[in-house]
Amino acid sequence: MASLIYRQLLTNSYSVELSDEINTIGSEKTQNVTINPGPFAQTNYAPVVLESWEVNDSTTIEPVLDGPYQPTSFKPPSDYWILLNPTDQQVVLEGTNKTDIWIALLLVEPNVTNQSRQYTLFGETKQITVENNTNKWKFFEMFRKNVSAEFQHKRTLTSDTKLAGFLKHYNSVWTFHGETPHATTDYSSTSNLSEVETVIHVEFYIIPRSQESKCVEYINTGLPPMQNTRNIVPVALSSRSVTYQRAQVNEDIIISKTSLWKEMQCNRDIIIRFKFNNSIVKLGGLGYKWSEISFKAANYQYNYLRDGEQVTAHTTCSVNGVNNFSYNGGSLPTDFSVSRYEVIKENSYVYVDYWDDSQAFRNMVYVRSLAANLNSVKCSGGNYNFQLPVGAWPVMSGGAVSLHFAGVTLSTQFTDFVSLNSLRFRFSLTVEEPPFSILRTRVSGLYGLPAFNPNSGHEYYEIAGRFSLISLVPSNDDYQTPIMNSVTVRQDLERQLGDLREEFNSLSQEIAMTQLIDLALLPLDMFSMFSGIKSTIDAAKSMATKVMKKFKRSGLATSISELTGSLSNAASSISRSSSIRSNISSISVWTDVSEQIAGSSDSVSNISTQMSAISRRLRLREITTQTEGMNFDDISAAVLKTKIDRSTHISPDTLPDIMTESSKKFIPKRAYRVLKDDEVMEADVDGKFFAYKVDTFEEVPFDVDKFVDLVTDSPVISAIIDFKTLKNLNDNYGITRSQALDLIRSDPRVLRDFINQNNPIIKNRIEQLILQCRL
């Protein structure tokens, strides 16, 4: 039955309105555009998969260790350490503002007895007593407050690295003192810091004060090995060419301007608030099993003050590179299990797309020099109770990660009404204490943040920082860049599909199994699938064409086309015969596929992997084989038909996507069997395989080669009632050989009889198949 629908999708054509084609082109067309790099280049959206070689373009990063530079005289900028690297010079540095501060640094070699030496300081000859009875070098800091006073010995730095430092900050001059590796900083105050000039007699480096910890590290432990090679040649300070412009936190600076365009630099502080979202899906049955617990994208809107201006911001938080965990407490229906739950760890990334209504986000299309600096934040997991029908509840608790800023690019953020050009901030992760565990299970001591309760009661997580960018905008501020309408239309459709998927998944428990079996036996075709939609015949024809076009681009349709070749007579009604028959046109191609599988069996050592690969190909054989029983696609189509009839969100726009998606995702865990005399061989897509006798259900050794030969020559049967269910049914109720053969062949009459008798084992199996019909 379902194969008839799929054949119609592959072969039939229907009339369609031209307006439908135009809408499709407008919403789905993509084109390759080559941008000529010049003064202005359009930035790309952020990548979905991150690679180790990824770098941020047009981002200027201030070096931690800038140099070395040749000896010179200059007025050093404030908030930059001058790291002095002498060789054997006696006078290292002289600095003064000629009003209230004169500082000189003298270098004394190891093992020097008390003696008087002559130095030339600020053009004057001075006799200064020095002594160094250690094996390290000593820096003597000489100081005076007025031009007529004598120099006094103020501080000493004893160093085995032979490095010293000098800094102008706030209203003081800072230097190092003490003994390495525990040297610290100290200061001398002045009323005129800006006029302090220096004469540096040695090679030196420049380090920003924001990296002061690095400067302290170099003073105490030495320069990196690379800086100590003979290939490092000092250059003149003029090569640095630094413009010391102290930008405000929030300001717009016009970089350049022509008659039509101008470059605008935007500097903004920023407060990012975000939260995680998750999806918790529970399996059917007795209520002891969960299907999946995963992260979902989460939107958050909020207001905050920026320099007295009220800003409305919108963020979208998503994750990449999740780790899949699972827990299985046993095979019984009352054993607690979670098939899959997601955890983010060190190999994961968190994306936060940020947009606000300020001027900075207008016309954000052509952007360069995009940079940001953000704080880190710790995200901790809370508790989640697995509410079991009976017994003590397992409790998931703990887990934490820290988010560290790792880059920023442009992105597009979709809201309910418009798509917005926004900034995507990327965060790398480190795991933190405490680890997570599941109480009353053996899961404990694992690190990362699981998707169970990632917000832990917090309304949001908050990160503060700032960003800057240079944007090409029209000279006339009244112009704005339009948003592509087709992008918004397509996003609206995606949102409708999301609502429809949630509704479809929630309808699974409302389907009566007896009606499902009856519906699965009906000769459904394309038009009968549309009965739940109130529309005209013309609309139905147009909709059928849309479904057909979607399906032809799917992976399943491509596989079927390759397998079956021409199916020109597929639109005609195919009646079921009393015996199993195969589509002749598929035999030769399937034989080729089987030979490929058999040929690969020697190279693949894992039998389970072989069975999984073979079972996934068996679905193609299932679609091209008609039997007197049911197959998985009969159930899939019946469930789809029932949900379409009950749905309130279905429409001609969403049905094509839903039908195509259901053909791929409904009942992903399929099992197939072949029957030879009194022996049944069964395999599923997870790689599990069985061989057993029909009379006793006693397992026998599984012969892979025999199985490959059988699937080439014999019909493939959908294992609606799998081996585990058959054995359970026989052990608890006892079944005859005739009943066993009927269940093995998935005879719908026998299935209906068992369901009408309210047999719990058969009912539970059919319920599980219905619950697997998820999008």
From Swiss-Prot:
It holds the Pfam family VP4_helical. InterPro entries: ConA-like_dom_sf, Rota_A_VP4, Rota_VP4_MID, Rota_VP4_MID_sf, VP4_concanavalin-like, VP4_helical. A motif (DGE motif) lies at residues 307-309. Residues 247-478 are annotated as: Spike body and stalk (antigen domain). A motif (YGL motif) lies at residues 447-449. Residues 509-775 are annotated as: Spike foot. The record marks R230, N231, R240, S241, R246, A247 as: Cleavage. This is Outer capsid protein VP4.
